Design a protein with these regions (language model features):
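N-terminal type II signal-anchor transmembrane helix
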Residues: 2-34
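A transmembrane-helix-recognition feature enriched in membrane-embedded lipid enzymes
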Residues: 173-199
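A structural signal for short, hydrophobic/glycine-enriched beta-strand patches
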Residues: 23-180
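Enrichment for repetitive, rod-forming helical segments
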Residues: 10-14, 68, 189
């Protein structure tokens, strides 16, 4: 009996490992996809702040959003990110102030200030889009983060165009691999969660 249990456990582990590797490859391939097209708004997924300035990763996303805005893809930028512990302002507010320093007018920016994770970024952004009568968006994040983000956007029925940042803080494989492993873990975990949520 115990041998049979161990055998099935080993098979399950092997299957999960192979599936995770497949997902990792899919994430890497998807990272190269840029679907930028005219849309009602540009959603920038949050990536933390130090209380005064967006993190380096967040700044890369903001710079890309500014480029899309200046190139005429949309005239509204929707920033996401709630309050980090100890911070006076939300991550979205700090990002908004940063955009203003880059010349983006205040009335071109919408703030989503409740979220703490990617799933909430999109759920609460969806509510703002509905309130503002916005139907489509360009979704901005890091290349390796795009597949999971687009999957979640689809879950919330947000018509989105993938637009990964052309530059990223994860340049070498030394920095890419840990980030890819983390993204893959959460990607697979979210799919498993959806399966059990339906049971």
């Amino acid at each position: 009996m115990m041998k049979r249990i161990l055998k099935w456990a080993a098979l399950l582990l092997a299957a999960l490992t192979l599936y995770s590797l497949f997902c990792a490859l899919s994430i890497v391939r998807y990272a190269e996809r840029d679907e930028s097209a005219p849309a009602d708004c540009i959603i920038v997924l949050g990536a933390g702040t130090d209380g005064k300035m967006p993190s380096p990763v967040f700044r890369e996303r903001l710079h890309h959003a500014v480029t899309l805005y200046q190139e005429g893809y949309s005239d509204i930028i929707l920033l996401t990110g709630g309050y980090s512990p100890g911070n006076e302002h939300s991550d979205a507010w700090i990002a908004g102030a940063y955009l203003q320093s880059l010349g983006i007018p205040e009335d071109a920016v919408l703030l989503e200030e409740r979220s703490t994770i990617t799933q909430e970024n999109l759920r609460f952004a969806k509510e703002i889009m509905e309130n503002e009568n916005l139907s489509t968006c360009i979704l901005v994040s890091d290349p390796l983060h795009m597949k999971r983000s687009m999957m979640m956007a689809k879950e919330y029925e947000i018509e989105s165009f993938s637009s990964p940042t052309p530059t990223t803080r994860y340049q070498s494989w030394r920095t890419k691999l840990p980030f890819l492993a983390r993204v893959t873990f959460f990607y697979v975990g979210y799919q498993v969660y959806k399966i059990f949520a339906k049971v």
